Amino acid sequence: MFTLIAKNQYGQQLELTHNDAYSIKSIDGLDPPEAVINTTHNAGLDGSVYNSAYMSDRVITITLAIEGPAEENRINLYKYFKSKFPVRIYYRNATRNVYIDGYTRVVAISFFDIKQVAQITIFCPQPNFNEVMADVQDMSSIENLFEFPFSIEAAGIPFSEIIANTEKSIRNDGDLETGVQISIRATGTVVNPKIFNVETGDSMILDMTLAAGDLISIDTRTGSKAVTLTSDGVTTSVVGKLRYGSDWFSLQPGDNIFTIAADSGAEYMKAVFTVTGQFEGV
């Protein structure tokens, strides 16, 4: 069993499964997309030399029968699948709960069949499926201070304490390498905040000073790369503050060890990593 939902650019959703108005006949394009392999052929030698490879765009084709009243249900489809406009497709089965963004390429209707059939083609420039529920991982941890037996003094006692870790394993539960969203909130003065991937040696260093309350937001995902500073309610781009040679982090599937530091004030850095797992197919 599976669930298929379409969301249009206005945030309106239409479930195509478990819906008496439509009967899905087939969905093509849910498997891993075709790879394009670039090679060079050398004169006089058999075979070729591998140069590079990339995944093709994804095309999803949904074929469904339109149940009665056909006119009403067909026109309702047009609200969610508008040619050239964006649409988000949600797909859930027993092991995946994912979405993918695309654009409606064509909605073809067999108007004069006894039962009308719609074939909807969606073009997805980014071919990977994304987890619906992003995994938010805090560099800080909570140390439990509540033990039995106990007595509470007049001044009170703490039940737990937040420990600001400077190194932590950040997990990517997807099948593919993916970018990451990182937020760093300063609780005091931080000079030149730094983030390191311990295993790969990649680093990202910002040549700037943060004041208490400042928030740095980093996004290393394909198509969304950005570094911004939110200070006193105003958000500005600070990509220009990246030190030369800084890397845009990419997380391998599984555990990725990260550490945070600064020239001074590292203890005032509260870092949170948000990972959206990606998959080739469902």
Predicted regions and their residues:
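Oligomerization/assembly interface segments of phage tail-like spikes and tubes
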Residues: 45-68, 114-128, 256
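Short beta-strand and beta-hairpin "edge-sheet" elements
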Residues: 90-132
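Solvent-exposed edge beta-strands and adjacent loop segments
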Residues: 1-57, 97-108
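"Short basic amphipathic alpha-helical interaction patches in structured regions
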Residues: 73-81, 117-119, 134-139
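Intrinsically disordered, low-complexity segments enriched in serine, threonine, and glycine
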Residues: 137-282
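A general secondary-structure signal for short beta-strands and their flanking turns/coil
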Residues: 42, 55-59, 84, 115-117, ...
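Short, acidic/charged, Gly/Pro-enriched secondary-structure junctions
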Residues: 65-107, 257-259
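Short, surface-exposed secondary-structure junctions/capping segments
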Residues: 30-33, 114-125, 214-231
